[in-house]
Amino acid sequence: MRQLPAGPSSLACSGCKAGRLVTVPFSSRDAEDQGSREGIGWQPPGRSWAHTTEQEGKHQVAKATVHPPGPDALLLNQVDPVQCCPTRL
């Protein structure tokens, strides 16, 4: 096999692939799926994404225990509207 000379075209080709992973803009569907969460937009070149239920097209539902409000909790109709939303004059 012949070795190709290391010219600008081969450098551009090798740099192009790594650059694409970083600079590809998200499609509108990706932006909707990811929302405003941080730390998801960039993946180092050469590493594959881990398979999670969210990436498989299913939304991950966090299971949370819902506690009933305590006796000192204010219900919506008990909140003073002046204290909550002051009017601007």
UniProtKB/Swiss-Prot annotation:
Gene Ontology terms describing biological process: behavioral response to pain; negative regulation of DNA-templated transcription; negative regulation of transcription by RNA polymerase II; potassium ion transport; regulation of neuron apoptotic process; response to pain; sensory perception of pain
Name of the coding gene: Kcnip3
Function field: Unknown for isoform 4. Csen is involved in calcium-dependent transcriptional repression, regulation of potassium channels, and perhaps in processing of PSEN2 and apoptosis.
Disordered, as annotated region: 27-57
One Gene Ontology molecular-function label: calcium-dependent protein binding
Name of protein: Calsenilin isoform 4
Gene Ontology CC annotations of this record: cytosol; nucleoplasm; nucleus
Domain of life: Eukaryota
Tissue specificity comment: Isoform 1 or isoform 4 (T+ forms) are expressed at equal levels with isoform 2 or isoform 3 (T- forms) in brain.
